[in-house]
């Protein structure tokens, strides 16, 4: 079986006039078996972000690919969530889980870039993370990876939040 052809240049997230970055993660051909035969359709997975810490994931199904993608984009815009970032990276190492997928996300110094695979890369690009190291363990299903990545990003706490929980000052936390 031949390997799928890969793009040499990284794909940039498509930016709309409202300032949102959109990225299509996966499109699957699906079939529904009925008495008269098979009905072909498409399922799309997309992520939308503002490049400043907001992220949304959407799924859409339809008989045609463009309609499925449009439905997924609309759902992603409705399900936006805010995550805490620190100058293009995360504050600390976090683990995200969904189903059989575990994702480890680590902060990285300036100039590192996004070192992450497929579906995780799309999430980081639209959310506004520019320097990060991430690794997925377990299932590599794009749906699970996107959900686990968003789960991990939602667990990131700022130093101020950690200091408030511990009853200390931010200076004491950062040592």
Curated annotation (Swiss-Prot):
Residues 20-83 form the S5 DRBM domain. One of its GO terms (biological process) is translation. Residues 1-21 are annotated as: Disordered. The keyword Membrane does not apply. This is Small ribosomal subunit protein uS5. The keyword Ion transport does not apply. Keywords: Ribonucleoprotein, Ribosomal protein, RNA-binding, rRNA-binding. The N-terminal domain interacts with the head of the 30S subunit; the C-terminal domain interacts with the body and contacts protein S4. The interaction surface between S4 and S5 is involved in control of translational fidelity. InterPro entries: Ribosomal_Su5_D2-typ_SF, Ribosomal_uS5, Ribosomal_uS5_bac-type, Ribosomal_uS5_C, Ribosomal_uS5_N, Ribosomal_uS5_N_CS, Ribsml_uS5_D2-typ_fold_subgr. It holds the Pfam family Ribosomal_S5. With S4 and S12 plays an important role in translational accuracy. Located at the back of the 30S subunit body where it stabilizes the conformation of the head with respect to the body. SUPFAM superfamilies: dsRNA-binding domain-like, Ribosomal protein S5 domain 2-like. It comes from Dechloromonas aromatica (strain RCB). The gene is rpsE. One of its GO terms (molecular function) is rRNA binding. Signal peptide: none annotated. Part of the 30S ribosomal subunit. Contacts proteins S4 and S8. One of its GO terms (cellular component) is small ribosomal subunit. Belongs to the universal ribosomal protein uS5 family.
């Amino acid at each position: 079986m031949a390997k799928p052809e890969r793009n040499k240049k990284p794909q940039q997230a498509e930016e709309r006039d409202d300032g949102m970055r959109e990225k299509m993660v996966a499109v699957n051909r699906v079939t529904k078996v009925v008495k008269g035969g098979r009905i072909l359709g498409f399922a799309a997975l997309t992520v939308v972000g503002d490049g400043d810490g907001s992220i949304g994931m959407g799924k859409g199904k339809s008989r045609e690919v463009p309609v499925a993608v449009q439905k997924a984009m609309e759902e992603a815009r409705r399900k936006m969530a805010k995550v805490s970032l620190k100058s293009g990276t995360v504050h600390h190492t976090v683990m995200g889980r969904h189903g059989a997928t575990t994702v480890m996300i680590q902060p990285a110094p300036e100039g590192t870039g996004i070192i992450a695979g497929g579906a995780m890369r799309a999430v980081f690009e639209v959310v506004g993370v520019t320097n990060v190291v991430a690794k997925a363990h377990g299932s590599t299903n794009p749906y699970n990876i996107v959900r686990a990545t968003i789960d991990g990003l939602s667990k990131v706490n700022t130093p101020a939040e950690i200091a408030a929980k511990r009853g200390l000052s931010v200076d004491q936390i950062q040592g």
